[in-house]
Curated annotation (Swiss-Prot):
Pfam families: Cpn60_TCP1. Keywords: ATP-binding, Chaperone, Cytoplasm, Isomerase, Nucleotide-binding. Its EC number is 5.6.1.7. Forms a cylinder of 14 subunits composed of two heptameric rings stacked back-to-back. Interacts with the co-chaperonin GroES. It catalyses: ATP + H2O + a folded polypeptide = ADP + phosphate + an unfolded polypeptide. GO terms for molecular function: ATP binding; ATP-dependent protein folding chaperone; isomerase activity; unfolded protein binding. This is Chaperonin GroEL. The lineage of its organism: Bacteria, Thermotogati, Deinococcota, Deinococci, Deinococcales. Its main location: cytoplasm. The gene is groEL. Transmembrane segments: none annotated.
Length: 545
């Protein structure tokens, strides 16, 4: 396909039109009084949302050059969303402001590369200032506020904080769709993995179709168990203690499984067997996690262990084990806390280095099972459209709460971005030429989120921004929900995670700087529409013979 090349001012202005198209659709959602955007779907009912990244992702422009600008701005929103789960609209508004002010200066003859350097230096100064303003999250009340603001719903904030209280800050919280109208929080206590009993003969409670073992030993074996002679010594030792036994192995089959079932049915030994969770190296690591939680050892040939030589002190212990057809839950494992902490730290170190989203998700699950537990928030609603929108708000609020725990919270409502302006102005005075202009571009952009929040609430943005900038109170700001100024935004519960504010600014400046330094665009040439086929002669009735 033939390509079209566009240069200089024409290229940059085309990108700007695309940026504005996305930003204008997204920015109406900003703040407590932001408006909804309705998105048409080819199949099913339309989506109604106040989420910036959801709106941005739906925008496709007909003009190919403008569409490139739109895609670049969408990148700001999606990158911010990937890292923090929130702040996408703020990032979009900042990006639009940087592009607008920057292109005005480039058109006036400024050096784009010097402007970009100035913007980058200003962003570094601003992010340092944001870190200084951050307040650590000490209690669930702060989590409740920050999650509630993200979702625009105090009830959502309360449920996220409630779930975090139950499973701890490291715990896994999943959001699922409920079959009923109500939203409820379920907590899975203990360590759970998705493998159930190998045979239904191990069931102890036929009404609930589950096996429950109280104060049980746990044999953790890496390989398959099929020969009875290997298993017999450990069975005899456990039988002498009159305690139940859970066997976790790659598989239990043949005469070994038959013997376990016979002993269970005779009442000689209360026993159950489940397959080990995971596959390959991940299975080995998960077995080591179970060993740490229960205070046992993994029986592995790699470590020189043989099944027939297993002693009671190599077995794990737990106060209660519940096994269903699909999952096993170990409650109150008797592991050594120091060993569990060592496993947690090892997983955290691995999380820092992994690039794969799938690996990160699995590591996060393992971390939760070791550190706290798993909470499931089942979101209920009256209609499918409401359910989708509500579930999305819960997911955003959860990501925001996690970001708040990581780097603390700052004053919301665009106030923090206004508070870092003096530091950026000070930097601009130390720079020269177009670099100083670049820093001043960021100063103007930092005002834009607060202006937009005020505008969406029906107020005059410039008046609000000037009032906040002229105040000597460090957390003085504007509550757009009530239309009043507040002496301390953090105390009033109007907060944002510092990580969200920082990431939004960094991503906006990164893509904004790239657009300013663009000198040419290469894109596909629009295809010419083919002329319609000629109609038949009139006297032939429009038909061919």
């Amino acid at each position: 396909m033939a390509k079209q090349l566009v240069f200089d001012e024409h290229a940059r202005r085309s990108l700007e039109r695309g940026v504005n198209a996305v930003a204008n659709a997204v920015k109406v959602t900003l703040g407590p009084r932001g408006r909804n955007v309705v998105i048409e779907k080819k199949f099913g009912s339309p989506t109604i949302t106040k989420d910036g990244v959801t709106v941005a992702k739906e925008v496709e422009l007909e003009d190919k050059l403008e569409n490139i600008g739109a895609q670049l701005l969408k990148e700001i929103a999606s990158k911010t969303n990937d890292i923090t789960g929130d702040g996408t609209t703020t990032a979009t508004v900042l990006g639009q402001a940087i592009v607008k002010e920057g292109l005005r200066n480039v058109a006036a003859g400024a050096n784009p590369l010097a402007l970009k350097r100035g913007i980058e230096k200003a962003v570094a100064a601003a992010t340092e200032e944001i870190k200084k303003l951050a307040v650590p999250v000490e209690d669930s009340n702060a989590i409740k506020k920050v999650a509630g603001i993200s979702a625009n719903d105090a009830q959502v904030g309360e449920e996220i904080a409630n779930a975090m209280d139950k499973v701890g800050k490291e715990g896994v919280i999943t959001i699922e769709e409920s079959k009923s109208f109500d939203t409820e929080v379920d907590v899975v206590e203990g360590m759970q993995f998705d493998k159930g009993y190998i045979s239904p003969y191990f069931i102890t409670n036929p009404d609930k179709m589950e096996a429950v073992l109280e104060d049980a030993y746990i044999l953790i074996n890496e390989k398959k168990i099929s020969a009875l002679k290997d298993l017999l010594p450990v069975l005899e030792k456990v039988a002498q203690t009159s305690r139940p036994l859970l066997i976790i192995a790659e598989d239990v089959e043949g005469e070994a499984l038959a013997t376990l079932i016979v002993n269970k049915l005779r009442g000689t030994l209360n026993i159950a067997a489940v397959k080990a969770p995971g596959f390959g190296d991940r299975r080995k690591e998960m077995l080591r996690d179970i060993a740490a939680v229960t205070g046992g050892q993994v029986v592995s040939e790699d470590l020189g262990h043989r099944l027939e030589n297993v002693t009671l002190d190599m077995l794990g212990r737990a106060k209660r084990i519940r096994i269903t057809k699909d999952e096993t839950t170990i409650i109150d494992g008797m592991g050594n806390q120091a060993e569990i902490d060592a496993r947690v730290n090892a997983i955290k170190a691995e999380l820092e280095t992994t690039d794969s989203d799938y690996a990160r998700e699995k590591l996060q699950e393992r971390l939760a099972k070791l550190a706290g537990g798993v909470a499931v928030i089942r979101v209920g609603a009256a209609t499918e459209t409401e359910l989708k929108e509500k579930k999305h708000r819960y997911e955003d609020a959860l990501s925001t709460a996690r970001s708040a725990v990581e780097e603390g919270i700052v004053a919301g409502g665009g106030t923090t971005l206004l508070r870092v302006i003096p530091a950026v102005k000070q930097l601009a005075e130390s720079l020269e030429g177009d670099e100083a202009t670049g820093a001043r571009i960021l100063v103007r952009a930092l005002e834009e989120p607060a202006r937009q929040i005020a505008a969406n609430a029906g107020d005059e943005g410039s008046v609000i921004v000037n009032a906040v900038l002229n105040s000597d109170k460090p957390r003085y700001g504007y509550n757009a929900a009530t239309g009043e100024f507040v002496d301390d935004m953090v105390a009033a519960g109007i907060v944002d995670p510092a990580k969200v504010t920082r990431t939004a600014l960094q991503n906006a400046a990164s893509i904004g700087g790239l657009i300013l330094t663009t000198e040419a665009i290469v894109s596909d040439k629009p295809e010419k529409e083919k002329a319609p086929a000629a109609a038949g002669a009139p006297d032939m009735g429009g038909m061919d013979f």
